[in-house]
Amino acid sequence: MKRTYQPNRRKRSKVHGFRARMSTKNGRKVLARRRRKGRKVLSA
């Protein structure tokens, strides 16, 4: 059986990257929440 996590750098950044987050309203909300919480890393 194929495992669910098949690492791929391009997909990772396209889906969870900073620019992907900034491109939508809700993505910006995610970043704002993570900043408020004090996360060292905001996005993949």
Swiss-Prot record:
Biased composition (Basic residues): 1-19, 26-44
Keywords, in A-Z order: Ribonucleoprotein, Ribosomal protein
Domain of life: Bacteria
Transmembrane segments: none
GO biological process, one term: translation
InterPro entries: Ribosomal_bL34 (IPR000271), Ribosomal_bL34_CS (IPR020939)
Region (Disordered): 1-44
Pfam families (alphabetical): Ribosomal_L34
GO molecular function terms listed in the Swiss-Prot or TrEMBL record: structural constituent of ribosome
Stated family: Belongs to the bacterial ribosomal protein bL34 family.
Name the record gives this protein: Large ribosomal subunit protein bL34
Native organism: Geobacillus stearothermophilus
Source taxonomy: Bacteria, Bacillati, Bacillota, Bacilli, Bacillales
